[in-house]
């Protein structure tokens, strides 16, 4: 079937997108700008296909016109009666319509440095790949080991990091994950470092490995802290 000529589409749908139809209507006008009603009239006068189902295609054209940056809206002057603003082609969008060819689909013009999108009858902005509801995953916190604890608090007694992280009876190959808030108590440990040092058994390593006697004494919280340690002392510090 031969392809219809430029002005002989009759009832067939012309191979132009709504963006190209709008461009042709504006460029054929004397002032290079038209109100929306005149754009509709131009299309219906030139292409009989658009004389039916006018509400459907006019809504689609208006949607594309509003969201495509290659067209700019110009307020109607006071000396020109009528309703609605005028539409014109953006000065920087002339490259989209080079050679006067409106048959080919070209990339959508973005006036503010955005990415180009393909021109379709309906244009919907692409959703953001990074959503506030789906933030980037947080990196896992590293386990706190005795060397790390000693480096953070160099004034701690030598036996305190091992005792805090590996209580008697616990497998020394498995490190504990301390709550960061628990490190706030370290200054209170330092106040009683002498009492804690004296109450910590020297055979601590043997107790951890399980080779020590069951009668070995395990240091208790009361032995490591004096009676002045309380919740009030934490809050007042």
UniProtKB/Swiss-Prot annotation:
Compositionally skewed regions (Low complexity) per UniProt: 206-216, 227-237
Gene Ontology CC annotations of this record: nucleus
Role noted for this protein: Lin-31 regulates how vulval precursor cells choose their fate. It helps specify three alternative cell fates in vulval development.
Top-level taxon in the UniProt lineage: Eukaryota
Listed transmembrane segments: none
CDD domains tied to this protein: FH_FOXB
Gene field: lin-31
Protein name: Protein lin-31
UniProt keyword list: Developmental protein, DNA-binding, Nucleus, Transcription, Transcription regulation
GO biological process: anatomical structure morphogenesis; cell differentiation; regulation of transcription by RNA polymerase II; vulval development
Species in which this protein is naturally found: Caenorhabditis elegans
GO molecular function, one term: DNA-binding transcription factor activity, RNA polymerase II-specific
């Amino acid at each position: 079937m031969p392809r219809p000529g430029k002005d002989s589409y009759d009832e067939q749908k012309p191979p132009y997108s709504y963006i190209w139809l709008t461009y042709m209507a504006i460029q054929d006008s004397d002032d290079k700008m038209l109100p929306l009603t005149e754009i509709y009239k131009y299309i219906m006068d030139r292409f009989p296909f658009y004389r039916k189902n006018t509400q459907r295609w006019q809504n689609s054209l208006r949607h594309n016109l509003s969201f495509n940056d290659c067209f700019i809206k110009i307020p109607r002057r006071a000396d020109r009666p009528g309703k609605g603003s005028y539409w014109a082609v953006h000065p920087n969008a002339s490259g989209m319509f080079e050679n006067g060819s409106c048959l080919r689909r070209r990339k959508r013009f973005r006036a503010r440095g955005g990415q180009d999108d393909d021109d379709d009858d309906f244009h919907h902005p692409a959703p953001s790949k990074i959503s506030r509801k789906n933030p980037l995953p947080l990196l896992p916190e590293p386990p706190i080991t005795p060397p790390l604890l000693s480096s953070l608090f160099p004034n701690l007694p030598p036996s305190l990091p091992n005792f805090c992280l590996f209580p008697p009876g616990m497998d020394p190959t498995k490190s504990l994950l301390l709550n960061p808030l628990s490190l706030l108590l370290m200054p209170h440990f330092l106040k009683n470092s002498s009492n804690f040092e004296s109450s910590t058994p020297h055979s601590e390593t043997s107790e951890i490995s399980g080779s020590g006697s069951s009668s070995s004494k395990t240091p208790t919280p009361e032995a490591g802290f004096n009676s002045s340690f309380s919740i009030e002392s934490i809050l007042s510090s």
